[in-house]
């Protein structure tokens, strides 16, 4: 795993610095899973606990800006197995395997049925699959949910290029494949394709976040497994079986899932609310964390 420390100071650093956090390690499904628990600042008592699942190729750092804007909420945030600090699962890294891991993790942490499950991007698929499959939770929150197959999104051609890129990474010898899959130029192109803000400093920070954390996967097998999982399933597969109130926090400029698909997805859940954040794409957690946190707090009130 390549480790590159961030070089650009977070615009949310002051808020995040006030949040007490601890790191624990729990062995789940063969993975030494690293888990960060963020408590409300100032000794405030948490009124609810949220377990948050980050997106593809990310780690727990990605959702920290949202955490920093929440009040009265305890957030428990693991690195997905095979990404960040967590070691891989024993077997394949499929949606089903990740959902089973999440269910087991929640039980291992002793979190009861009042827990709220949150997922961003690929994490929205994992979270939905877990809750639909029996993870006991009181509510479900999906940020930038993958509402439809990625190949059918507004920029499906980019997904097709990504498929070709990962196929190339799989076909090459191990060392060469690893190099291709961690290529800094490709990471930057991906970041440029997703960012929407015109704020130069915020853009610099977002690119630095991707440069720092987007290649912290354990090995080629893990990232290829997870990519196949991310493009072979979506939240709509599981929506009808989610029996708890659900919040969809979508973006009007998301290139992965078009807004009309989010409205369709809302109708597939037995009980779902849709909040649309304007002027942002697939990076709500980086560009509009305050708005995301406000929607989440209103939903949990």
Residues covered by each model-derived region:
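Conserved acidic catalytic loop of the alpha/beta-hydrolase fold
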Residues: 97-115
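Catalytic histidine-centered segment of alpha/beta-hydrolase-like enzymes
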Residues: 280-293
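Conserved alpha/beta-hydrolase catalytic His-Asp/Glu region
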Residues: 175-240
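Acidic catalytic loop of the alpha/beta-hydrolase fold
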Residues: 253-257
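Short glycine-enriched nucleophile-adjacent loop
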Residues: 124-135, 140
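Conserved HGGG/HGGXW glycine-rich cap/lid loop of the alpha/beta-hydrolase fold
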Residues: 34-85
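Short beta-strand/loop motif that positions the catalytic acidic residue
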Residues: 242, 248-250
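Flexible "cap/lid" loop of the alpha/beta hydrolase fold
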Residues: 139-174
């Amino acid at each position: 795993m390549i480790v590159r420390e961030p070089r650009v100071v977070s615009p949310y650093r002051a808020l995040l610095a006030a949040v007490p956090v601890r790191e624990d390690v729990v062995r789940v499904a063969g993975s030494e899973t690293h888990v960060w628990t963020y408590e409300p600042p100032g000794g405030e008592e948490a009124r609810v606990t949220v377990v948050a699942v980050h997106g593809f190729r990310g780690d727990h750092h990605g959702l920290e800006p949202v955490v920093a804007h929440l009040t009265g909420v305890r957030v428990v945030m693991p690195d997905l197995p095979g990404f960040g600090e967590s070691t891989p699962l024993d077997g394949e890294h499929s949606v089903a395997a990740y959902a089973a891991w999440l269910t087991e993790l929640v039980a291992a942490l002793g979190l009861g049925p009042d827990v709220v499950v949150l997922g961003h991007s690929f994490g929205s698929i994992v979270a939905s699959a877990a809750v639909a499959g029996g993870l006991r939770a009181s509510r479900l929150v999906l940020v930038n949910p993958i509402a439809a197959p990625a190949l059918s999104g507004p920029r499906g051609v980019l997904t097709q290029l990504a498929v070709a890129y990962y196929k190339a990474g799989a076909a090459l010898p191990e060392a060469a494949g690893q190099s291709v899959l961690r290529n800094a130029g490709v990471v930057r192109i991906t970041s440029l394709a997703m960012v929407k803000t015109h704020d130069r400093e915020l853009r610099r920070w977002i690119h630095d976040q991707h440069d720092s954390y987007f290649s912290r996967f354990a090995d080629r097998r893990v990232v290829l497994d997870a990519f196949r999982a991310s493009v072979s399933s979506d939240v709509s597969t599981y929506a009808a079986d989610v029996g708890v109130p659900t919040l969809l926090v979508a973006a009007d400029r998301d290139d992965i899932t078009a807004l009309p698909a989010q409205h369709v997805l809302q109708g597939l859940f037995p009980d779902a609310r849709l909040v649309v954040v304007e002027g942002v794409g697939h990076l709500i957690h980086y560009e509009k964390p305050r708005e995301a946190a406000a929607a989440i707090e209103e939903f949990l009130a």
